[in-house]
């Protein structure tokens, strides 16, 4: 395990973007594999669906996520902290990063980007219309579920994990989250949203 960590540390230092592209694509694909295994929609495994998830994770999300976490690393509590201890200052800075991540990236970048790009990759006759319908049906409920799952984890991530490893840690944690997103995207198991967010099923079905 130590040798794997050392090897990854070397790769992320020398080739951060390529390393994140490979690991993010693999872990997004793993999330879809898990979704299809736990909640199969048919007897036949959909390899194209897993390839779409892998493509999205590696080509779309990884470069954006890499830049986003490096940007968040530079964001701190905006008001003067001259009279507080270093510990309090660190807590305020961490809370600020989590707040920006959850109030900016999640609702306006992460969730819309996922549903939009994945709808296009499915090659529907009218992919933009499909993307709008999925966003209308799932955006708010996905966001509420996101706020149940992610803030506590991101507090840990921003407080304890070095910036170069944050996307990797998020991606590992995201295997379960990607499983959830893949299930919602393919609207075969909308009961997942109902169980987590306690909303009426009629509000989320397309």
Swiss-Prot record:
Superkingdom of origin: Eukaryota
One cellular-component annotation, GO: mitochondrial inner membrane
Keywords, alphabetical: Membrane, Mitochondrion, Mitochondrion inner membrane, Transmembrane, Transmembrane helix
Pfam family of the protein (one): Mpv17_PMP22
Transmembrane segments: 16-36, 103-123, 155-175
Keyword Transit peptide on entry: no
Location in or out of the cell: Mitochondrion inner membrane
Topology class, membrane: Multi-pass membrane protein
Keyword Transmembrane: yes
Main location: mitochondrion
The protein's role, per its UniProt record: May be involved in cellular response to stress. Required to maintain mitochondrial DNA (mtDNA) integrity and stability.
PANTHER family: PEROXISOMAL MEMBRANE PROTEIN 2, PXMP2 MPV17 (PTHR11266), PROTEIN MPV17 (PTHR11266:SF17)
Family under the similarity heading: Belongs to the peroxisomal membrane protein PXMP2/4 family.
Descriptive protein name: Protein SYM1
């Amino acid at each position: 395990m130590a040798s794997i960590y050392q090897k990854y540390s070397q790769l992320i230092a020398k080739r951060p973007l390529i390393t994140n592209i490979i690991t993010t694509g693999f872990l997004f694909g793993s999330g879809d594999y898990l979704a299809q295994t736990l909640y199969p929609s048919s007897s036949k495994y959909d390899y194209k669906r897993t390839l779409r998830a892998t493509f999205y994770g590696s080509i779309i999300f990884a470069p954006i996520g890499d830049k986003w976490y490096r940007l968040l690393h530079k964001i701190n509590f905006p008001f003067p902290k001259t009279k507080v201890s270093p510990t309090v200052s660190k807590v305020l800075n961490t809370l600020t990063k989590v707040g920006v991540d959850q109030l900016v990236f999640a609702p306006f970048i992460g969730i819309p980007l996922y549903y939009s790009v994945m709808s296009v990759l499915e090659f529907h006759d009218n992919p933009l219309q499909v993307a709008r319908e999925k966003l209308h049906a799932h955006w708010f409920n996905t966001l509420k579920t996101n706020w149940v799952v992610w803030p506590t984890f991101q507090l840990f991530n921003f407080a304890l994990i070095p910036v170069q490893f944050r996307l990797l840690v998020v991606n590992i944690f995201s295997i379960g989250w990607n499983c959830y997103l893949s299930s919602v995207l393919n609207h075969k198991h909308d009961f997942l949203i109902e169980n987590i967010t306690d909303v009426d099923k009629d509000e989320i079905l397309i």
